[in-house]
Amino acid sequence: MQSLEKRFAKGLGWGLIDNFSGTGINFLVGILLARQLTPEIFGIVGVSLVLVSISTTIADAGFSNALIRKSEVRPIEYSTTFLLNIAIAGAIYAVLFFSAPLFAAYYRIELLTPVVRAMGISILFAASAVVVKARLTRQMDFKTQAIASLTSSLVSAAVGLYMVYHDGGIWSLVAQQLIRQSLYAIGLFVLTRYSFTFHYSHAAARELFAFGSRILFSSLLTAVYNNLYYFVIGKVYSPRQLGLYSRAEQFSLMIALNFTLVLQRVSLPALTKNKNDGQKLESVFQRLYKFSALLGSLFLFSLAAMADNFTYVVVGKQWMPSAPMLSILAIYSAFPPIIALHQNLLQVRGESKLFMRLEVLKTFLSACIVAIAIWIDFYTLLGGIVLIGVLSLGINGYWGSKFLPTYKQFKQIKDTLYYFLISSFVAFIVFLSSKLAITPSSKLGIQIAVFTLISLFLFTFVLKGERQMLKQIVRPSVKNEEQQ
């Protein structure tokens, strides 16, 4: 029987493999597609993905978090959740299908109708996999999820690239997204060999929905809050501007989203195991907090410093207007991984009502800031996004720290500022190092080398304690995997 720490370490290790391999493949494919397609096409797909993302959140109905959070889950609760998710997903897709022309009229993009209808099919596949993913997460089995994710990413990438080089246009992106989601769901069923007993319990549904409904509302607000800019930019500006923003955001989220997803998937069950022991809960939370604040800011601040050369080398001259957007969004992206930890803390403490209220407050503040900034100019809007990140961390940190014995918000702010200052210093050196070369590719190469050398120096001589902490958190034990 493995200790929680060893299981957590393995979980985080496989979670990293899952997210970084899957997202890494899609990142590379996205680069190749961006060299063949225009920003306008990416803008259309970006709007479609937002609509599908919000619809998928509704289809989940908060049940996945409810299943993970429960101390024990009966078979009838799994089968009830599966049936509910499929039914809700079917209804949501029907609404999306018939409302697609309305969105096309709103954005004045006729092509949006068939694209939204096609990409919406992925909602059904995502809903069918909710229960299997929840069971695997409860067992901290992220290896199975990683295998399914890697396989689906490779196959969908191959299809997408084949289509784009054979004049597939926008449908190359649509096919890639659909195939990835469908194969991932099918892969989970095949690997787990899980079969459902199609039984339904109204009592079980009512119990799960009591908790899940609050998480659903909060998750829906979060989805709208995270994608609010897509709706606004696409309407107020143009599909091209939205496509440029989308590309910059995807580059910045390559790091931030992976950290956030891994921490949410792994920390939720780990924190749940210790929810009745305040000291252990705080110990796990504090290590994860430092982990996300340090690594997130270190990589993202340096990415902001490399934005010009990175954009030119990776996706070409036509995407250069997105470089300053990337610099700003990379700084903002250091905040979501830390915020996600506080959200998990509230969930494991059973504070779903507070969770929901905080999401309402943050969404309201975000809407106010966007409503003001959008009419000034585009870069004021981006500055407003960074302000939203700071305020969101402050709000979640204030209320989340109330459930920790000694690691209060003041200590968290000190840790955050300490790691952000170190990361800012590294980013400044990385920025200056580009002056040593002439061509963008050589500048980028020097910047990456300088970032790597400085990071190694810091972890070897300055951040020794943090290095040990990262080893304890990240390194999965192969020996323990064999013993499980």
Which ranges hold each PLM region?
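Membrane-interface junctions at transmembrane-helix termini in multi-pass inner-membrane proteins
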Residues: 5, 9, 66-75, 125-148, ...
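Helix-loop junctions and terminal segments of transmembrane helices
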Residues: 26, 56-75, 137-138, 248, ...
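Signature of the first transmembrane helix
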Residues: 4-61, 86-100, 122, 152-161, ...
